[in-house]
Amino acid sequence: THPETYSGKRVLVIGGGNTAIDAARTAVRENADSVTLVYRRSEDAMPATQQERSIAKAEGVQLKTLRSPARFVGENGTLTGLECNIMQLTAPDYPGGRPNSAPTGETETLEADLVVLALGFENLPVAGVNTDPHNHIIIGKDFSTSVDKVYAGGDAVTGAATFMKAVAAGKDAAAAIFARLC
């Protein structure tokens, strides 16, 4: 990153995962005037770990939960804020799942000079590769999928996790592929 990107700015980071936390903490370190993480559910429902959330808050990141971005607000071609729908928690899609959120009909505009999108991902369907109900790829102990010579690891298998876990899974999958080739 370039320090001038964040320095002196009111930064909003949209997202609730560890990537969003990393982006927010980076903005704090790069001397942003304020950094607020905007998430559509409650703090407890964030996919980011409790440890990551605690560290971010200790470093000065503010959390604005139960807010879902609706539109950017600007003046003379310059961003001035983000209008958010105020949300309320609703039942999860499945037992043990994170709660969903629905708009209350109210809105709030958060001031911002810079907005960072740190939103999740969705696995793309791959022909013949079996997935679980959460669309995570099902693998064997050797990282093999249901398609011969196709291997998977990282977030595509576990869902959102840490960078280090994804790197470790990549190394393990590479070792399994190498073992199969030899």
PLM regions: where:
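Redox-cofactor binding/interface segments in oxidoreductases and associated redox assembly factors
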Residues: 13-14, 84, 117
